[in-house]
Amino acid sequence: PHHLEFDRLFGKNDTSYERLNKAREMAIRYHIIIVLKGANTAIITPKGDVLFNSSGNAGMATAGSGDTLTGMITGLLAQGYHPIPAAILGVFLHGMAGDLAAEKDSQEYITARDIISQIGQAYKKLHNYRV
């Protein structure tokens, strides 16, 4: 969820720090993975580990973007990925696809369809990456 959705689910938080701590608490209590969407999307594991994503941009705060992310993560689960790696890879690829969409046009005009259209290129870029 994004911050407003999270607050509706788990109660209002006055700061992002408070929200992150509440997300850790909820992930541990309910043994769930929480993907807290935002400028640096956080993935919180059932053990309370917090991982921050480095890909993505402000233009991705658009209708349908979260649905696209959910579809990407569930698609990875359907392929046999374990839940935590599926969340991490899904969030990163989603952000990378958004970055590619922004490079192609402009982050001010990104739609969910633009993100979807760049998923293949994001995979290709990731496969070609060398450490």
Question: For the regions a protein language model found, what residue spans apply to each?
Answer:
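Gly/Ser/Thr-rich beta-alpha loop segments that engage phosphate groups in nucleotides
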Residues: 40, 58, 66-69, 73, ...
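Charged C-terminal helix
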Residues: 98-131
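Conserved phosphate/ATP/ADP-binding segment of small-molecule kinases
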Residues: 1-50
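Short, well-structured alpha-helical segments that form the helix of a local strand-helix-strand
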Residues: 19-27, 83-97, 112-120
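Short pre-catalytic strand/loop immediately N-terminal to key active-site residues, enriched for Gly-Thr
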Residues: 51-64
